[in-house]
Design a protein with these regions (language model features):
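Active-site-proximal N-terminal segment of extracellular/periplasmic enzymes that hydrolyze or transfer
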Residues: 34-92
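Non-catalytic, well-ordered alpha-helical segments in soluble enzyme domains
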Residues: 69, 84-85, 182-191, 443-480, ...
């Protein structure tokens, strides 16, 4: 779901905060495009980390895809399990936010895993236009590897694909972390913390599991929504425990079940029926949601797989798979510091379909609260309470469904990118430019055909005419050209700074569109109804940028913190706790949340915000958390 949305007037609020985030990173050089294996920090240590009681035995990164930061404030009173434990026992950075505009899944997961921004790690979106190959590429696409499906007990005819623990899928290119240009925290942990460290990652999405694990891992597992099969690729070892688990527990066991509301009606904050254009995941607009696909009782199909992914059943399945990994691999019981990451994707699918102001999103989180309670209890019993550290965050937030806001009089809508393309072509045609002049528009990124942008740069009047035409499109707030963003320019404009932090010269567009707040991308033909309903993300607006950052466990001082923080701070902080060094980082170590065994800096408990920070937040929340 290549989503994106609105931007520009999120208030004087995060203007100061975003600029502060980018002051130091702006001085750092963009990582050279070299193999992460060349990192100077990749020196394997022979020291056994198991004897140091100040270090965790297991590092766990939990990512809830598309979890807005304000969901905790809105829904936590209904939580009694794992989410409640994170808030109560963890170090919660209340105002954490991404300081860049490319708030998408691949970008956020890469930032969490590396401690760097897109301008350093190179993952600028879920996909981008490859100028050399003249085609779209996904962020984890790798033609040198093959994806391998795990058999799950179904006959091949039922699954729609050749299955087996060592069989290749039909996809032309496989998936790996080859396009991520710097090492992940998990890789550095494996190289530096001592022999025996195991790295395990899992998610419904390949781009989530792979980027959290990095280039070298012991088990990386994701799900193919087209076949309903779990898979890995030849870039990683196949995991016998995964093969056994999915064979014993096929996803199709959930066929015919119904997702009904968990909470009493009085507990839900919003209207029962979500405002939506279209049919969300093949469901109706209100509970209950039966998981019966398009065949309605004739067996699992692709529609069922979409429904399953857009339901709490998928999160529960991943939780059980993670518990199996801990049990079978004895994670947290070896000679090194082990690593486990789980990215829960269903909140993202539910959010895209129903929006953040829906019963479904509230219910999904209430059920995840139960799953995480079970998971933490399992870790307490197998690894030991106090012997593991958890980092909890999200890859991005999300905008409200624009129609939901529009009916209240807010300027919100769907920015038609085909109209943007048409305006560019109409502007350049009489100036004798090649037709077509536009090769691809992917959300904010506009890519021109070969030679067109070079010609435009030498013709400033034509370039300005194109930008003016684009800015006349309903929903467009601003257009930047590449030269305004390259090399992270020093700027007091927080929007330009945010776009620059997400810009990577050889991958980003020639022009970048900044939508107005509460406007999201629409790829339908001009004048036609919106192709997709629901909502999306992918802009430098606060509702896209603000996400949870919570640390809990070994080395962490619990409390509620109001200091500036970003998910890029997670990897540096975990590195400090584990006693390793990252190759490249744009984030900082959150010293204020570390206990005395890890840091001599920082406060002892909850930190009240300064008056400037409090003023900044109040301004930001005025419309941005609608």
């Amino acid at each position: 779901m290549a989503g994106v949305m609105a931007r520009f007037f999120y208030g004087a609020n995060k203007i100061v905060a975003t600029a502060l985030f980018l002051v130091l990173p702006a001085a750092l050089p963009i990582a050279a495009q070299k193999s992460p294996s060349q990192s100077a920090s990749h020196k394997t240590s022979t020291k056994d980390a198991s004897g140091d009681s100040s270090k965790p035995k297991l590092v766990v990164i939990l990512v809830v895809d598309q979890m807005r930061g304000d969901y905790i404030d809105k829904f936590q009173r209904q939580w009694t399990g794992g989410l409640k434990r994170l808030v109560d026992e963890g170090a919660w950075f209340h105002e954490a936010a991404y300081p860049y505009g490319a708030t998408e899944t691949c970008v956020g997961h890469s930032t969490i895993s590396t401690g760097a921004f897109p301008a350093s790690h190179g993952m600028i979106g879920n996909e981008w236009w490859d100028r050399e190959q003249q085609k779209d590429v996904t962020c984890t696409a790798d033609a040198s590897v093959k994806n391998m499906a795990y058999e799950d007990g179904r006959a091949p005819a039922a699954s729609g694909a050749v299955v087996g623990a060592s069989s290749s899928t039909s996809k032309a290119a496989g998936d790996s972390a080859a396009r991520m240009l710097i090492p992940a925290f998990a890789e550095e942990l494996k190289f530096q913390s001592g022999a025996g460290t195991r790295v395990v990652a899992m998610s419904l999405k390949a781009r989530a599991a792979i980027t959290l694990a990095g280039h070298q891992a012991d088990s990386v597992t994701w799900w193919d929504g087209g076949t309903g099969l779990w898979q890995t690729s030849s870039a990683y070892p196949q995991a016998p425990f995964i093969a056994e688990f999915v064979k014993l527990h096929p996803v199709t066991e959930d066929y015919g079940k119904t997702w009904a509301s968990l909470l009493p009606e009085s507990a839900y904050l919003y209207d029962k029926a979500a405002v939506n254009v279209g049919s969300p995941a093949g469901y109706g607009s209100t509970f209950p949601h039966p998981l019966r696909g398009a065949t309605d009782g004739k067996g699992p199909d692709v529609s069922f797989y979409l429904q399953w992914a857009t339901s709490p059943y998928a999160e529960t399945y991943l939780t059980h798979m993670a518990e199996e990994a801990v049990e079978k691999l004895q994670l947290g019981s070896g000679a090194g510091i082990d690593f486990l990451s789980i990215s829960f994707s269903s909140v993202d699918y539910v959010g895209h379909a129903f929006g953040p102001r829906s019963w479904e999103i509230q219910d999904e989180l209430a059920r995840l609260d139960r799953d995480l309670d079970e998971f933490f209890t399992h870790l307490d019993k197998t690894v030991g309470r106090g012997k593991y550290v958890v980092a909890f965050s999200s890859d991005h937030g999300v905008a409200p469904v624009p129609e939901d806001l529009h009916k209240t009089g807010v300027d919100a809508g769907r920015l038609n990118l085909e109209e943007v393309r048409s305006r560019i072509e109409q502007t350049l045609e009489p100036l004798h430019y090649a037709k077509p002049s536009v090769a691809r528009i992917d959300g904010a990124d506009v890519y021109f055909t070969r030679g067109t942008y070079t010609k435009l740069k030498s013709d400033p009047l034509a370039l300005q005419a194109v930008i003016d035409a684009m800015q006349g499109t309903p929903g467009v707030a601003r257009v930047y050209h590449a030269e305004e963003l390259d090399d992270r320019p020093a700027t007091r404009n927080p929007i330009r700074a945010a776009e620059a932090a997400g810009y990577f010269k050889t991958r980003s567009g020639d022009l970048l569109i900044v939508p107005k707040p509460y406007w999201i991308w629409d790829y339908s033909a001009p004048g036609k109804p919106a192709r997709n309903g629901g909502t999306s993300h992918g802009t430098p607006h606060y509702y896209d940028q603000r996400v949870p950052v919570i640390l809990m466990g070994t080395g962490i001082r619990r409390g509620k913190y109001y200091e500036l923080a970003t998910p890029a701070d997670i990897a540096p902080t975990l590195a400090t706790i584990c006693g390793i060094t990252l190759a490249t980082q744009d984030g900082r170590t959150l010293h204020e949340a570390l206990d005395g065994s890890q840091s001599t800096q920082g406060p002892s408990s909850t930190q009240a915000p300064s008056s400037a920070q409090a003023r900044s937040r109040s301004e930001a929340h005025t419309p941005a958390d609608r």
